[in-house]
Amino acid sequence: MLSVLDALWEDRDVRFDISPQQMKMRPGEVLIDCLDSIEDTKGNNGDRGRLLVTNLRVIWHSLALPRVNLAVGYNCIINITTRTANSKLRGQTEALYILTKCNNTRFEFIFTNLVPGSPRLFTSVIAVHRAYETSKMYRDLKLRGALIQNKQLKLLPREQVYDKINGVWNLSSDQGNLGTFFITNVRIVWHANMNDSFNVSIPYLQIRSIKIRDSKFGLALVIESSQQSGGYVLGFKIDPVEKLQDSVKEINSLHRVYSASPIFGVEYEMEEKPQALEELTIEQVQDDVEIEADEHTDAFVVSRLSRISYFTRQIIYILIFTRMYSGWFHHSLTKLHGSIRFNSVTIAADFLYIYISQNGTKIVK
């Protein structure tokens, strides 16, 4: 049996110019954020690209040439900070600095957001990396950890206990230690009954093999961990033999389920999904309201309007507003030739036009 970790490289390696197949999400990997207009300022200055933030790694690729890309696993990151950098596309600006170490080689990456004033580049990468760092219990073998509280296993998010077996001997010493054995969907945990701090947590991610072997204590459950976790060989004595066999079957079954869909424990949700640029664009609305008509303006009436004296205009305004609520007003308004602009000057001229259209020009001297 191979551990999931033997095939897992995404969070434990730094790679350049990876294939499209390697850029795809592996089982258990989730895309958390996607940022366009990101520049790899140190390696590809002046080249606009896209940054993918997953629960295991950060991927950058050029938009013009997708084969120009890089992948940075969170386990390789030593430090993340923000500094000022010189970008060909934005000039001097704040950038995200990521210092990594992989196979005794250090790499430094500088990413610049080409969208002015957007903090998503910093918040997404830094927050997801922090979530990765605080969820190592899902992925790392842990000895003498704070696992037990009031004789109960402290469950991780999304973790479920499938079996709890009392009276299990840990065979790490000559005389053995009596304790309690937990089988969950994420890991195997054992702790001593006399001392809760004497314990071990073995994630399925780190398990290389699960077998029943003979020992000086009789048949025992033997778990071999991956080389990355130290290559431990841990033995547990479970009685009776039938219970031992059932436990091995259950662990192997849960290990297969986990291998098909691993739970890496990196949980992070964007508080607000980024909006498209089109959604952020607000259409300008004019203050004036126009009602356009299909018919042409009556040239005769317009010529008569130009001959009305100031005194006559005032009389017409009074007549119009005293009859505003009569039936002809609404009817005339809807038959208006031309346009209405709701301001103090043009509305008076339009009302005058309505009145003359309905009553002729007999008041004009």
Swiss-Prot record:
InterPro entries: BBL5 (IPR006606), BBS5/fem-3 (IPR030804), BBS5_PH (IPR014003), PH-like_dom_sf (IPR011993)
Keyword Membrane in annotation: yes
Subcellular location: Cell projection, Cilium membrane; Cytoplasm, Cytoskeleton, Microtubule organizing center, Centrosome, Centriolar satellite
Alphabetized Gene3D superfamilies for the sequence: Pleckstrin-homology domain (PH domain)/Phosphotyrosine-binding domain (PTB)
GO cellular component: BBSome; centriolar satellite; ciliary basal body; ciliary membrane; cytoplasm
MF (Gene Ontology): phosphatidylinositol-3-phosphate binding
Alphabetical UniProt keywords: Cell membrane, Cell projection, Cilium, Cytoplasm, Cytoskeleton, Membrane
GO BP: any one term: intracellular transport
Highest taxon above the source species: Eukaryota
Family: Belongs to the BBS5 family.
Entry function: Required for ciliogenesis.
Subunit structure: Part of BBSome complex.
UniProt-recorded name of the protein: BBSome complex member BBS5
Source organism of the structure: Xenopus laevis
